[in-house]
Amino acid sequence: MPLEGGNGIAARDSPLSRKLLRDRASNQMHRRQTHSPRPSVTEPRRALLLAVRSFVRAAQVCPGVLRIALMGSLVTSKAIPKDADVLVTIDNMMDLTELASAGRRLKGSAQTINLGADIFLADTTGRYLGRICHYRECHPRMACLAQHCGRREHLNDDLHVVTLSKELLARPPIDLWPNVVRRLTVPPDVETLLLTELERPA
């Protein structure tokens, strides 16, 4: 299957180019390292992929959501991913309430198997905004690492903790919505459980 770029032009498909894309999917997400994942189920990838699919279905109808993409360890063949990493491009003026609710459901599904999920946000200019906050209501907390807590509801702008490169924002490994776009060789479970289902007519 040809690999598609964000502009619809076929990219070179070679073992080296696929390896570089996989490396970029992790290297361009700069975050502090924590403990190794210890999921409570034998097939954590399946559980996370199903949770991501549900998130996409919910997020795609949120006014202001323009693109949903998948990145991180789920786009690799890593048997035990640490979490589900989703990138959502938004209209910078959108109300984040509905998207945050969908994000908390994704996080909750991941937490039930002792894993995590992050919903990263970018605007239409390719600027990284931060992550969806996992708290339902915004008020001062010692655990909150947002640089401007409360300035925008449901946005955790902890850019000193996590940053995404402009290249990753522009060309994430897999676009999930509004169109499925593969920029690397997709693991079989991602293809079967996620992409094939998302490509089915509504």
Label the model's feature ranges.
Residues 87:
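Aromatic/basic-lined ligand-recognition segments
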Residues 14-67, 75-81, 90-202:
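Catalytic core of pol beta-like nucleotidyltransferases
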